[in-house]
Regions:
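N-terminal helix-cap/turn-to-beta initiation motif at the start of protein domains
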Residues: 20-29
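Central antiparallel beta-sheet cores of small beta-barrel/beta-sandwich binding domains
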Residues: 34, 40-119, 159, 183-195
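Bacterial N-terminal signal peptides
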Residues: 7-16
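Structural motif
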Residues: 31, 53, 126-128
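Bacterial N-terminal signal peptides that target proteins for export
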Residues: 1-7
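Surface-exposed interaction patches
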Residues: 100-151
Length: 195
């Protein structure tokens, strides 16, 4: 009887010790870079956990090569986002986390004000994020792969004040970045960030 009891007790300590030693799985919290299919960086986003769901806010835009300056307000948006400044605008809303997958959310295209269903999936190492916007069913949509940026990509003082919001949780300690500090792509200059 005693050997079985001690074996069970040792197993319990072993399992508990392994669970306590496992690092937390990464989340989408933090900075992300979005690029188009040609590799031109379009924007940086900041994800936070708010009221139990994740949202992503626009924190930096880049001028596309050969295009005019990026739009400054969401003139085609509806509701409380109508004519809101682009910097700090919530583009992705209501994302519920289930492991590395996020769903039940929406994504806004600020160019035309259209809101699409959205789902996301975080790579196991936490450095890539597949973002899919769709109409009706996920099969009818488009996916972009975003890249995680270092936590110090933008100093907190330089973030649009709307980016964090009053009840946003600070991002957890991120997974270690595998790249050096990210600079704007060659030939692109970031616009001045309003304070």
């Amino acid at each position: 009887m005693k050997p079985a009891f001690f074996a069970a007790l040792a197993s319990a300590f072993l399992v508990t010790g392994q669970a306590m030693a496992a690092p937390p799985s990464p989340t989408v919290s933090g900075f992300w870079q979005q690029a188009d299919d040609d590799g031109h960086v379009g924007a940086w986003f900041y994800f936070v956990l708010r009221d139990g769901v994740y949202e992503g806010r626009l924190v930096k835009m880049f001028k596309p090569p050969g295009d005019e300056a990026p739009i400054s307000t969401c003139s085609k948006c509806e509701g409380d986002q109508k004519d809101a400044p682009m910097m700090g605008l919530t583009i992705i809303k209501g994302m519920h986390r289930n492991g590395t997958k996020y769903d039940e959310g929406s994504i806004l295209d600020p160019r035309d004000g259209t809101v699409y269903h959205a789902q996301m999936e975080l790579a196991p190492d936490g450095q890539k994020l597949s973002v899919r916007g769709y109409v009706g069913v996920p099969l009818l949509g488009k996916t972009q792969v975003w890249t995680r940026l270092p936590d110090d990509a933008i100093a907190p003082a330089d973030l649009p004040k709307e980016s964090l919001g009053p009840d946003a949780a600070p991002p957890p300690t991120p997974a270690p970045a595998k790249t050096a500090a990210v600079k704007p792509p060659k030939g692109q200059k970031p616009p001045a960030i309003p304070k």
